[in-house]
């Protein structure tokens, strides 16, 4: 016997929402999904009227749905935003080159300007070349650090007020688990924040899909017939995040609400005043925001350029110590020159 849509619209149910278990028709699902994102945006004051917002676009399901929904809500609720697409080309053959074609399709479909920046032009390296140097064990460290800074660089070039990323509820729950397992209190503090960064020296990042389940994002893209790229990064299978994702999926089988439970728990965490907070400043080399001197991107890049790519790996790597020592020696030489010039 056909099941009726729970919203009592008179239509037959076409799906069951993973988040609530409600049986809904497609139109009611679209309305509920979009309304929840609008509530997230408005209740968290993610944007202000007249702002220019860069949508971090990879061509995947999350960024494609984010671009589609932001354009829709911007028009429906008159946010008054100037939306642009910002994409980073890491230089991964057979993955990013193909996904960028989808990003260009997004540009045409949503009539948004698109800016593409590559690791090659920013750092002089592609991920293919980096992996050839270091192997596959730590490639996500390089890619993650470079990508975060590349988005900042692109946002600065575009003159935007904020960057909207496609992080969904599953991503955030996985990150909470990863930071707990690694004992990374610095990242654990801010990984559930819906808005990060900001201030005089950095461009804020916002997560409009923070409370949206990955399964529902896939369903929305499917029923809306959105064009997106679904191939996984060729280097991703070795990522540490994969273990957290598998663990989360196992937990979800026995407790369907576990994703939101973990996010809410992460939001409620409190740390003792004695726990040191990393102080964010400006990297003296590249001029971008960092919690260390020099920034991690500069440390990793220095290792690559010296032919010692693993120098920057680890919480307090050999590369960090080497560069810190060089900075100390440089400061001593400058001080000695000042004293010499005084005579």
Swiss-Prot record:
Pfam families, A to Z: ATP_bind_3, zn-ribbon_14
InterPro entries in the record: CTU1-like_ATP-bd (IPR056369), CTU1_C (IPR032442), Ncs6/Tuc1/Ctu1 (IPR000541), Rossmann-like_a/b/a_fold (IPR014729), TilS/TtcA_N (IPR011063), tRNA_thiolation_TtcA_Ctu1 (IPR035107), UPF0021_CS (IPR020554)
Pathway(s) this gene product operates in, as recorded in its UniProt entry: tRNA modification; 5-methoxycarbonylmethyl-2-thiouridine-tRNA biosynthesis
Compartments in which it is found: Cytoplasm
Location (main, coarse): cytoplasm
SUPFAM superfamilies registered for this protein in UniProt: Adenine nucleotide alpha hydrolases-like
GO cellular component terms attached to this protein's record: cytosol; cytosolic tRNA wobble base thiouridylase complex; mitochondrion
EC assignment: 2.7.7.-
Top class in the EC scheme: transferase
Keywords in alphabetical order: Cytoplasm, RNA-binding, Transferase, tRNA processing, tRNA-binding
GO biological process: protein urmylation; tRNA thio-modification; tRNA wobble position uridine thiolation; tRNA wobble uridine modification
One example GO MF annotation: tRNA binding
Primary role: Plays a central role in 2-thiolation of mcm(5)S(2)U at tRNA wobble positions of tRNA(Lys), tRNA(Glu) and tRNA(Gln). Directly binds tRNAs and probably acts by catalyzing adenylation of tRNAs, an intermediate required for 2-thiolation. It is unclear whether it acts as a sulfurtransferase that transfers sulfur from thiocarboxylated URM1 onto the uridine of tRNAs at wobble position.
Record PANTHER family: ATPASES OF THE PP SUPERFAMILY-RELATED, CYTOPLASMIC TRNA 2-THIOLATION PROTEIN 1
HAMAP family: CTU1
Family: Belongs to the TtcA family. CTU1/NCS6/ATPBD3 subfamily.
The protein's name in its UniProt record: Cytoplasmic tRNA 2-thiolation protein 1
Taxonomy of the source species: Eukaryota, Metazoa, Ecdysozoa, Arthropoda, Hexapoda
């Amino acid at each position: 016997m056909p099941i009726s849509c729970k919203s009592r619209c008179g239509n037959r149910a076409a799906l069951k929402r993973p988040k609530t278990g409600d049986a809904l028709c497609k139109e009611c699902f679209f309305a509920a999904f979009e309304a929840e994102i609008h509530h997230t945006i408005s209740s968290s004051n993610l944007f202000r009227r007249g702002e220019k917002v860069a949508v971090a676009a990879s061509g995947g399901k999350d960024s494609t749905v984010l671009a589609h929904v932001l354009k829709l809500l911007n028009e429906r609720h008159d946010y008054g935003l100037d939306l642009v697409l910002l994409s980073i080309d890491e230089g991964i053959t057979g993955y990013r080159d193909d996904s960028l074609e989808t990003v260009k399709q997004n540009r045409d479909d949503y009539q948004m300007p698109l800016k593409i920046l590559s690791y090659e032009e920013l750092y002089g390296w592609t991920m293919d070349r980096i992996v050839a140097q270091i192997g596959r064990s730590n490639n996500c460290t390089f890619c993650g650090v470079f990508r975060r800074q590349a988005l900042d660089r692109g946002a600065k070039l575009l003159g935007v007020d904020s960057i909207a990323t496609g992080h969904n509820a599953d991503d955030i729950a996985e990150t909470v688990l990863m930071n707990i397992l690694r004992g990374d209190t610095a990242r654990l503090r801010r990984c559930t924040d819906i808005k990060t960064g900001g201030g005089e020296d950095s461009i804020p990042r916002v997560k409009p899909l923070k409370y949206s389940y990955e399964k529902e994002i896939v369903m929305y893209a499917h029923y809306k017939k959105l064009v997106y790229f679904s191939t996984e990064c060729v280097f991703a299978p070795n990522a540490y995040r994969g273990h957290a994702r598998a663990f989360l999926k196992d937990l979800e089988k026995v407790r369907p609400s576990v994703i939101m439970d973990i996010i809410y728990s992460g939001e409620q965490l409190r740390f003792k005043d004695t726990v040191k907070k990393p102080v964010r400043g400006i990297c003296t080399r590249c001029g971008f925001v960092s919690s260390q001197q020099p920034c991690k991107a500069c440390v990793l890049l220095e290792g690559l350029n010296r032919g010692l790519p693993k120098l920057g790996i680890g919480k307090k790597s050999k590369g960090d110590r080497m560069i810190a020592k060089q900075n100390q020696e440089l400061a001593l030489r400058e001080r000695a020159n000042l004293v010499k010039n005084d005579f």
